[in-house]
């Protein structure tokens, strides 16, 4: 999400009070939420060991976001965990899962829960892969967003470490 002008536009349009991160084991999204002054960040991550390994070997990405007071880590299955979250809790939800069809299907299956916990006028953003390398995958993500929100916007940013452009889809609830 860093360096994405579309993500920057999203931040300008909304309240940055509460964010939820689904996945994102490397901590990059959490770091960016901290830098954008979200007051409360709930980070739903399956495995604390993944975060520990990323902190150890990729420390610059997450900048030890788990140690920040504004970040609350919720370990375990994110989609099970969010079942207990109150309606209309989050201003922004970031979906940072693996970029494969399994994860697209997983997000689609749980989209009702994500919509439920997203505030009215809240924004959901997902990293959807590279349109250059896997255009069908990006299209599948856009279909999920459009079926649930009808207003998916695609942004693109060059990621040097990926050596390609990467896409993000955002929708407003």
Question: What are these language model-derived features?
Answer:
Residues 130-173:
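Class I S-adenosyl-L-methionine
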Residues 5-142, 164:
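The AdoMet/dcAdoMet-binding core of the Class I SAM-like
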